[in-house]
Amino acid sequence: MDDDVLEGLGSPLVRVDSPPGTTVAAKVESRNPGGSAKDRPALYMVEAAEEAGDLEPGDGIVEPTSGNTGIGLAMVGAVKGYDVTLVMPDGKSIERRRIMRAYGADLEIVDGDISAAKERADELEAEAGMVQLRQFENPANPRAHYETTGPEVLEQVGDRTVDALVAGVGTGGTLTGIGRRLREVFPDVRIDAVEPSDNAVLSGCEPGNDAFQGMGPGFVSPNLDVDLIDEVHTVDIDDAEAECRRLAREEGLLVGQSSGASNLAAKGVAAALRESGEYAGEEPLVVTVYWDSGERYLSAGTFDE
């Protein structure tokens, strides 16, 4: 028996539809207790602040978020007894707002993108004496994935070699943490990032459309270890949403926009590895990440067509 819901962190690795002669496998992170991959860094950042003496009973937490980190922090705050205030850009799905409030968090909506939310969180930190965990630069964010998600992948693949990790980038914590752990075991593993085609700053473009929810913040996060990255793939939001619908209707996997984008890129990498012969086992094994459930995107129209 777990002592509380936070001990339930963890997710399955599931083989999904893959190009012929390849294996694409996804970490289905909606199986975490708060429903996304961001539950892991939310817990790690809070516990790191507690251990450092920066967060004590009675303190309030403030954090800018596009949704999932905020939900994770709201859940952790509910368990540990912290008041949580979340600052979110307008235009993000109504489901995310409702889930945060359901956990008891206060929510402030700002005009603009995640940069505007960061500015407002800075103001609240200074004005109200709240503790900001700063997910974009907090080392506990990638460490959460290095110490939990990465080892889970290694256990779940068994004796197979991971040939590539393909994952979308927001804070960069997921790609950095899992990537560092996998590369320790598989030095030749390919690590590829995925970003929106309309907001492709990793590809050298100017910040653009913030339509993707949870991927492509419009700047390079300090938590993203760019030296790990072998290649960056861009995906159009319409293609990502079409893949979300396919995954739901053909494979029973209800996932969000960044997951659809990552899956498209992962299948492309798997096919390329098969064609080039650059893989270790009988066929290429490509791991990707499904961050959250498509339930958080219903009002966004992702599944309407």
For the regions a protein language model found, what residue spans apply to each?
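PLP-dependent amino-acid enzyme catalytic core
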Residues: 1-305
